[in-house]
UniProtKB/Swiss-Prot annotation:
The lineage of its organism: Eukaryota, Metazoa, Chordata, Craniata, Vertebrata. PROSITE patterns: PROTEIN_KINASE_ATP (PS00107), PROTEIN_KINASE_DOM (PS50011), PROTEIN_KINASE_ST (PS00108). Disulfide bonds: none annotated. Its main location: cytoplasm. One of its GO terms (cellular component) is cytoplasm. The autoinhibitory domain overlaps with the calmodulin binding region and may be involved in intrasteric autoinhibition. The RP domain (arginine/proline-rich) is involved in the recognition of CAMKI and CAMK4 as substrates. GO terms for molecular function: ATP binding; calcium/calmodulin-dependent protein kinase activity; calmodulin binding; protein serine kinase activity. InterPro entries: Kinase-like_dom_sf, Prot_kinase_dom, Protein_kinase_ATP_BS, Ser/Thr_kinase_AS. It is found in: Cytoplasm; Nucleus. One of its GO terms (biological process) is intracellular signal transduction. The modification Asymmetric dimethylarginine is found at R78. The active site is at D275. This is Calcium/calmodulin-dependent protein kinase kinase 1. Belongs to the protein kinase superfamily. Ser/Thr protein kinase family.
Amino acid sequence: MEGGPAVCCQDPRAELVERVAAIDVTHLEEADGGPEPTRNGVDPPPRARAASVIPGSTSRLLPARPSLSARKLSLQERPAGSYLEAQAGPYATGPASHISPRAWRRPTIESHHVAISDAEDCVQLNQYKLQSEIGKGAYGVVRLAYNESEDRHYAMKVLSKKKLLKQYGFPRRPPPRGSQAAQGGPAKQLLPLERVYQEIAILKKLDHVNVVKLIEVLDDPAEDNLYLVFDLLRKGPVMEVPCDKPFSEEQARLYLRDVILGLEYLHCQKIVHRDIKPSNLLLGDDGHVKIADFGVSNQFEGNDAQLSSTAGTPAFMAPEAISDSGQSFSGKALDVWATGVTLYCFVYGKCPFIDDFILALHRKIKNEPVVFPEEPEISEELKDLILKMLDKNPETRIGVPDIKLHPWVTKNGEEPLPSEEEHCSVVEVTEEEVKNSVRLIPSWTTVILVKSMLRKRSFGNPFEPQARREERSMSAPGNLLVKEGFGEGGKSPELPGVQEDEAAS
């Protein structure tokens, strides 16, 4: 593409696009020449730079994708590490194979300029060539996006700000850390759009091997859309529930280790997910599970989120979340319960509590004991862990730190997981980062995308072929494995949504 525009074909709007693209090129180049930010407390290596041509402008330098070997440094390979070496397969999360979340990963792209071109079968937004639609939903659509300079595909989500703001922000959260509220003073009241930008600023800085990565956000202040670019995980959900072929106990153990580390990282960042389930656990090309979909998540102050409303997927809800007591409940304990249901699904291919009717399902969750089928047979240690995770009393339910030490998880101590200090560092967001959490698109340019990307309103799993979606019934009888809390349309397992209360300190 050297010497020519990065467009699919020539268009009558090309001259206007070129003129807009040429604005502030000098400022743009100066902005690109700034110091490289650190990632998760680790200084990045020098970046290789690759030219990407923007219509009507000089070549703009974009970061080249780092090699995989630069990002997969095992915690146990550190000289100071104390973990035992172990032989493990490509999906192992044991000592010899776990990828360090603190190893450098490429920073979130900051787009200082946007150029759009349109053709009958192609739309290009900056360096992204938008391809097939891979998901549709109540809040927007998901398109496959190809970055030519990196030769890499991403998932671009186009979200409706009107629908987001109708639900008072996505995900809803209290004021940022360090505010007066955190110091015992009066809480700062945030406008809905401010909440959106603050949460985007947090999500952009989350950097963990077991959490889906947000790459870039673009915003058109005069139009209804936010454009979010995420890592594309082609393998999709780790499991569809129900299924006839559940995982072996060993495979379930390896996947659970990934989920627990990702969950501990989120809790360290003071985020409760609130919708852990197999369809929100996506499998990366490296064989590791990554937590996705923060549509009903909450961020909290203090040690834990104190919640008072129900959200998430009925079959994965904890007893206290569906209680009529009116009392607040622990956000962390909710995540542990949902992870326990997920672990049960891993080994049995179905949820522990199933019913066609929501009230009957709630009654079973609150009152009935966990039943272990005769087939497949599982170990007593695994049964012990499941029962502790599905303890109906949140006060006595096992926590993430104790799950990490459980004999079934560690193979009786032979394969310990890294400590919180080794794989978590707290993300802090400054006011400047919140202000710059999105890049603005000139309003006239997005008319093309509005017409080409917002044609349909209902959607399913963005990583699932359409034919398969039509053939497969919903995940559970009565659609009780489908997320609650959305008044308009369905929701993809990986599309952000917005239906939550405020988390109390």
